[in-house]
Amino acid sequence: MLSNDIDGNYKYYYADKDGHLQFGWVTHNNETYYISPPWGAENRTYLKNINEKTYLFGPKGRLLRNTATDISWDDFCVSDENGVVKTGVIRLEDNRLYYFNPEIYMTTPLSGEWAEFDGKLYHFEMPISVSPYSKGSPITTNTTLEKDGKTYIIDENGVATEKKD
C-alpha cells in the first residue's frame, strides 16, 4: 500500500501488509518505486543518484523507464529501460539528435554553434521546443558546412568530418 503525507510534508511511503514502512527499491502493482530512507518519495518528477547511477522518478517515487520529460523549468532529460538517465548524443521521438551533457540536462548551444564532445565535432541548429517547458538545439545531420575556411561533411549521426581533397 502506498501512503501519502504520513509526516505532513507531502512525502510518500510504502507500507507492507503488516504496516511496516519499506525503504529502498519497492515493487507495487507491477511498478517500481524508490522510497528514500528516512524521507520518503517526493510528489514531483525528480532525479536521484543511487549507487553512482542517476535515476529518473515521477511523482510518489515511481521509476520512469524509457521516458523523455521535463524535470523542472528548462531541464529536460531522458531515461533508458532501467530508468537510468542517459547522456551523450540521443535521438528523440522527433527523430532529431540532441546532446545531453554529463550533468544530465539537454545542451542548448546557440544556433550555428560548433562543439566537440568525446572527440567528435558537432554543429547545432536553432533551438526548438522539445516539451512545454524546455528547448533544445538539434544536432545538424546529413549535410556539408564550412567552418574556418574548411569544408566539413556531417553524417547521419551528426558527426562532422573535415573533407579531404
Language-model features: where?
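Extracellular adhesion/carbohydrate-binding repeat motifs centered on closely spaced tryptophans
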Residues: 1-165
